Amino acid sequence: GANSRTGFYLKKYNDIDLAGSSVGGHGNLNVIRFAEILLIYAEATFELQGKKLTQTQIDYSINRLRDRVNMHRMNLDELSAWGMDLETELRRERRIELAGEGTRYADVMRWREGELRFGRAITGPSLKVCMNDLGANPYPDTGVDEFGDVIYEKSTAEGGARYFDATKHYLWPVPNPERQKNPLLGQNPGWEK
């Protein structure tokens, strides 16, 4: 629908020729793009080679994506000179290229960064909540962090329900119907109750 928790919408895959039309939807769904294949190649090669890539491998993968949009090419010598970490840059590249495509959760779980990424408040754009004529927040249910960003869901430390338990949340529970079919299957740690 035409809803957004933040007020921002994703432009990816929208056909401008169909704007304002109630017909003409797409019959094809993008499941995987060549860009994702190149990113998978870069990450897998990096991991298999002991956290290293050659400039040739970066040119074959990351720089093909960057060349497509006339972006500055990734260069190992520059990364080193600027004190930048290759692993962080590869992950950032993936986060940007695949934004809005539904891969972020799986990436964070694979990288074991759940505590870092999911253990904090969800915030929106910096709106600097406007005060009404009486000097009060007209939206009392809306929390605002120290930067003026609207808080949609608070972390446990702030009294909300959001938290990430590393002993439990890296695995999903085994569904009860599957466990009933095979009582020897057991349950993943933390999901026993």
What spans do the regions from the language model cover?
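Acidic/polar-rich alpha-helix caps and helix-coil junctions
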Residues: 1-193
